Amino acid sequence: MTTEDHLLRTASQHSDSSGFAEDSTDCLSLNHLQVQESLQAMGSSADSCDSETTVTSLGEDLATPTAQDQPYFNESEEESLVPLQKGLEKAAAIADRRKSGSQDFPQCNTIENPGTKQSTCSPGDRVTEITEVEEDLFPAETVELLREASAESDVDKSSECEFTQYTTHHILKSLASIEAKCSDMSSENTTGPPSSVDRVNTALQRAQMKVCTLSNQRMGRSLLKSKDLLKQRYLFAKVGYPLRRSQSLPTTLLSPVRVVSSVNVRLSPGKETRCSPPSFTYKYTPEEEQELEKRAMEHDGQSLVKSTIFISPSSVKKEEAPQSEAPRVEECHHGRTPTCSRLAPPPMSQSTCSLHSIHSEWQERPLCEHTRTLSTHSVPNISGATCSAFASPFGCPYSHRHATYPYRVCSVNPPSAIEMQLRRVLHDIRNSLQNLSQYPMMRGPDPAAAPYSTQKSSVLPLYENTFQELQVMRRSLNLFRTQMMDLELAMLRQQTMVYHHMTEEERFEVDQLQGLRNSVRMELQDLELQLEERLLGLEEQLRAVRMPSPFRSSALMGMCGSRSADNLSCPSPLNVMEPVTELMQEQSYLKSELGLGLGEMGFEIPPGESSESVFSQATSESSSVCSGPSHANRRTGVPSTASVGKPKTPLVARKKVFRASVALTPTAPSRTGSVQTPPDLESSEEVDAAEEAPEVVGPKSEVEEGHGKLPSMPAAEEMHKNVEQDELQQVIREIKESIVGEIRREIVSGLLAAVSSSKASNSKQDNH
């Protein structure tokens, strides 16, 4: 089998039924290849019983042609006119021979117009028009549409063959070799009995040469026909981008209206070749066809090559068009520009309100910018206060405005605005969790900077900046989550009153939003814990860098301590209900008992304490190591604890809001072995004295207390002992934090379940 036969079998999946593979001569193979390529490039379908036919009216009992009239690819402008005249003469001779001698083939007449080449084959009473329109060369010329019914043709309809669906074609044959073989074979000019394939081929060939000649004269833009399309196919097939035929055209006869199919082929250098699904436009006159094609070409740019090929098949069926790759087939009204679905760039093709995908360029932008571009409803921007907490530490617009929106208002829209916002928040939190591990300043100590003191000084400012940013982020996350839980419990209590008045749709939405809020709260807690781990790691690095200079590190340790003070001095904006206050007090007592059992000091909560401070204190304790009052008591070099000086000043000013048992005296060296004294052994006078102690002692005692006596003891044994204590307390702190977090989750989930069950029981009673 020759190379052309192999190429033909690759390009055509229906060679057995059409009889193409019965003759293996080179000219026959190229003849069929030309017919296949021309029709396939235009995306046309043939006049057959199904929609997958791509060759017009070819029966199995018909003889295959062996003659080839003219070369297929003639690029020169000077040589193209002579074969055109020869083609006209040969077409007339073929028509005469067919009328005189052959009764077995359908009639095929070819007529040349200045801007249009048409071939009309009529098997029996069926009509097929294969039209290639060259649009803006002669816009004033009219195109004749010939429909000649042949009374001489006796081809049975049962002889029309059905073809399988097209698949992706790879045309890898060199264009130069094809042209050379075509010109060699055209010189032989062997004559044989013509067939409908031969006549269609002759018409398409003349149209190709005319289009090629006239398209070379274009300056600004180019219209690709089947010859140019074959070249582009060859180029892109070499690179590995096959040109795909999206789908064959439908096959329902809409008479007398012609349906013009528009296939948009995007060819851009270095990118994948794409064929859009065909769009169909109802046409009445050829003048409109030319004007519309001209308008479609004016929208094309210089960098991309657009091939718009208009075909007027006699049989169209609109129902089968959505089977193509992108099933968007649009009907254009009379006189409108045909709508070819253009391929938008990847950022534009994604939905702007997508909740499950994020644009690739957004990973480099701050998280606060992500949320402002997505809001489509007049609801507060909640994710600005959650994920990008460094934008506003205390601004939580969502917390205040969420309670003012009843759920019944949101149930009018199927995807409610609040649900969209909650899903967006959840999505942003998860993205920030992923980005947090990729943040270069949070990946732990720099091994190269550890041995050299010259590099320590250069790394230190970066660590400090990152440390401060993480403090603000974690503090804002903690505050927002606290307020979110306040409002959530308040709303649950309010909903119990109106739950029986809600419809089923509103109740379903309430439950869905409740689940979303739970997910947001859990993700926020995970993010907060990860931030806390980064803070601990950075604080350890800063302590290691600043260890030779204890007095300089007092400012840094004070900065660490201000984190706890700020957290505890910012109460929740709303009063928490009685059950929540009892829950937080119970949780605080549990934490104090756990601290005593592990050998650490806990803290006391007086009964007269306000609910805001209890709630913020307990939630910050459960989710982070550094933000609770009990951690201000750990003075043995724990990295999460801070200097005594800065936290104590707000505590003196807010004695009514917050009290804690502090085991400190002004003289730090005398407290070597008494760090883990239980709070029961201390009186309230000692607490007050300890609160005022840093003001009296000055920076030296702050440094000694904050560092847990590491710089104050020069002996090597004391240093080793303190390092062991640090490691032991860090392990204890991690165990305690995990236990407290589990207990807190169980308590909160139990409370929410109790409220939900009471809500359901109230609704049942109301129904009865």
Swiss-Prot record:
Residues 39-57, 102-122, 610-627, 667-677 have a biased composition (Polar residues). Keywords: Coiled coil, Cytoplasm, Isopeptide bond, Phosphoprotein, Ubl conjugation. Residues 682-694 have a biased composition (Acidic residues). Residues 1-24, 39-78, 98-124, 315-338, 605-647, 663-718 are annotated as: Disordered. Residues 468-546 form a coiled coil. The keyword Transmembrane does not apply. There is a cross-link at K317 (Glycyl lysine isopeptide (Lys-Gly) (interchain with G-Cter in SUMO2)). One of its GO terms (cellular component) is cytoplasm. Residues 316-334 have a biased composition (Basic and acidic residues). InterPro entries: SSFA2_C, TESPA1-like. Pfam families: SSFA2_C (PF14723). The modification Phosphothreonine is found at T665, T677. The modification Phosphoserine is found at residues 153, 177, 246, 248, 255, 268, 276, 312, 378, 411, 549, 564, 569, 572, 627, 643, 670. It is found in: Cytoplasm. This is Protein ITPRID2.
